[in-house]
Every structure is written in structure tokens, then in C-alpha cells.
Swiss-Prot record:
Catalytic activity, EC: 3.1.2.14
Gene: Olah
Protein name as it appears in the record: S-acyl fatty acid synthase thioesterase, medium chain
Lineage: superkingdom: Eukaryota
Reactions that this protein is recorded to catalyse: (9Z)-octadecenoyl-[ACP] + H2O = (9Z)-octadecenoate + holo-[ACP] + H(+); decanoyl-CoA + H2O = decanoate + CoA + H(+); dodecanoyl-CoA + H2O = dodecanoate + CoA + H(+); tetradecanoyl-CoA + H2O = tetradecanoate + CoA + H(+)
Residues with PTM N-acetylmethionine: M1
A Pfam family matched in the record: Thioesterase
Record function comment: Contributes to the release of free fatty acids from fatty acid synthase (FASN). Has broad substrate specificity, giving rise to a range of free fatty acids with chain lengths between 10 and 16 carbon atoms (C10 - C16).
Source organism (scientific name): Mus musculus
Catalytic site: S101, H237
Subunit structure, interactors included: Interacts (via C-terminus) with FASN.
Top-level EC class as recorded in UniProt: hydrolase
UniProt cross-references to PANTHER family, sorted A to Z: S-ACYL FATTY ACID SYNTHASE THIOESTERASE, MEDIUM CHAIN (PTHR11487:SF0), THIOESTERASE (PTHR11487)
BP term (GO), one: medium-chain fatty acid biosynthetic process
GO cellular component assignments: cytosol
Length: 265
């Protein structure tokens, strides 16, 4: 029988948000947020996902309980911090990464850091709505610092993912803009050359919305010597906000990890 522990305090709560601890879970799923996002959305997955998975959502500096900390300005710095937080909880169980958009790049660099420094790899990496890190077709990120508040509001409406009533809330927008600026600056500085050989060995699955403007997701296959799959679901860049899509993703992740564990062990 599944054992679950619901708690306000979490293990290593500074960086990792785990709302539902499952001591009997076979796998740990580590989720990485989109630009301007927090940990809550993915942390809630742990309450409804299959009992085989314990979900930990990454909480970046400058938001939620870390709001007093300065924003990170380097993706490699973020990866190092995440790895330090992860090590105590991933040594005893298989784990996987899921990242959406900006979070896909953090997940990738974190996986690289784990392999290079600790000879560890996620059982499976799930990326979402993100061009390959070395792709020449990565979307041009607008310079948020040069946009007016109204232009940022329009950009959020077009891009999706943020409810309209929140975008029109002045207090919310004032909180959101600094987060977006910090994360967008990281994305703009993140440059990655096409690898001459595979950097990872585990399978990568890429989810994307059918109406998303993101291109060259196929380039992720250059990253790994493992299998690579693309799954297209109805919707735009934030297709995963649709309940049916979210349920599909969670169920698919569980099935993939069950199959991957058979090959791995």
C-alpha cells in the first residue's frame, strides 16, 4: 500500500519543493520551472501522480520562500545548486527530470553536471516546449528591460500560460516582471554549441504543443546516445495547462520509467 506524507516542510525545502513525500515510491521525478515560474505548479503533481513517483519541484532563488535571495544570473550556477540539493535524495532511488521551456535547459545542464562530476544520470529526461540547446532556431527572446509594462502584459497574453485576470492585476505584474527579467537574461546568455558526440546516454522524450512556435525539437537527439521521441499534444506553448494533457504527461512518465527501469536494472 502506498505510504504518503503530506507536509508543509519539505526535505531540503530551500531548493526542492516536495508536497507529498512517498517513502515507498520507486522513482523520484525532479521538475524544473518555466521562465518566471515557481515550484508550486509541479510540486502539486506529487499529490495526484501515481504512487510510484515522488515529485520534487525546483524552487529558484528570488521567488516563493526564497524571495529575499538575489536572482541567479547563470544557468550553470543554478545547476550546481540543484545538484547539491539533489544528491542526498537521489543516491538511493532512480530519478528522472522534467523541464518545461526554460526549465528544459536547466534540466539538461543539471544532468550534464551530475554526469561529469558524479557519474550519475537521470533514468529518463523529459523536455517540453524547448528547442534543442544548440539549435540556431531557438526563439529570439525579447529584451524585457526595454519593454514597457504594457508590452510585457501583451507578451504574456500572446505567449500563454498566465491567466488573463492575473496579467491584468497590477500587483501580480509587479511581482512577475522581475522574475521574468531575471530568467530571460539567463536564457539570452545561454549559448551551447552542437556536441560532436552524445553527452548523455539515457532516453530523452520531448513534449510539445501542436500550435507552439518552438522549432527544432528534433535537435535534442544530438544530446544523447539513448532513444529520442517526440510527443505532440493539442495546444500552444503552455499546452500542459490543459488537464487532459497534464494527465497524459504524468501517466506517460510513469510508464516510461517503469520500462526504463527494466532495461537499467
Amino acid at each position: 500500500m502506498e505510504t504518503a506524507v503530506y507536509a508543509k516542510s519539505t526535505r531540503n525545502e530551500k531548493v526542492l519543493n516536495c508536497l507529498c513525500q512517498k517513502p515507498d515510491a520507486l522513482f523520484k521525478l525532479i521538475c524544473f520551472p518555466w521562465a518566471g515560474g515557481g515550484s508550486t505548479h509541479f510540486a502539486k503533481w506529487g499529490r495526484k501522480i501515481n504512487g510510484l513517483l515522488e515529485v520534487h519541484a525546483v524552487r529558484l532563488a528570488g521567488r516563493e520562500t526564497r524571495f529575499e535571495e538575489p536572482f541567479s544570473n547563470d544557468i550553470y550556477q543554478i545547476a550546481e545548486e540543484v545538484v547539491t540539493a539533489l544528491l542526498p535524495i537521489i543516491r538511493d532511488k532512480a530519478f528522472a527530470f522534467f523541464g518545461h521551456s526554460f526549465g528544459s535547459y536547466i534540466a539538461f545542464i543539471t544532468a550534464l553536471h551530475l554526469k561529469e562530476k558524479y557519474k550519475m544520470e537521470p533514468l529518463h529526461i523529459f523536455v517540453s516546449s524547448a528547442s534543442a540547446p544548440h539549435s540556431e532556431f531557438r526563439p529570439q527572446v525579447p529584451d524585457i528591460n526595454k519593454l514597457s509594462e504594457e508590452q510585457i502584459r501583451d507578451h504574456l497574453l500572446i505567449f500563454g500560460g498566465t491567466p488573463k485576470h492575473l496579467i491584468e492585476d497590477q500587483d501580480f505584474l509587479k511581482q512577475c516582471i522581475p522574475l521574468l527579467k531575471a530568467d530571460v537574461d539567463i536564457v539570452k546568455k545561454f549559448i551551447f554549441d552542437k556536441p560532436s558526440k552524445a553527452l548523455l546516454s539515457r532516453d530523452i522524450t520531448c513534449f510539445i504543443g501542436s500550435e507552439d512556435v518552438v522549432k527544432d525539437i528534433e535537435g535534442w537527439k544530438d544530446i544523447t546516445s539513448g532513444k529520442f521521441d517526440v510527443l505532440k499534444l493539442p495546444g500552444d506553448h503552455f499546452y500542459l495547462m490543459e488537464p487532459n494533457n497534464e494527465d497524459f504527461i504524468k501517466n506517460y512518465i510513469v510508464k516510461c520509467l517503469e520500462l526504463s527501469s527494466l532495461d537499467y536494472f
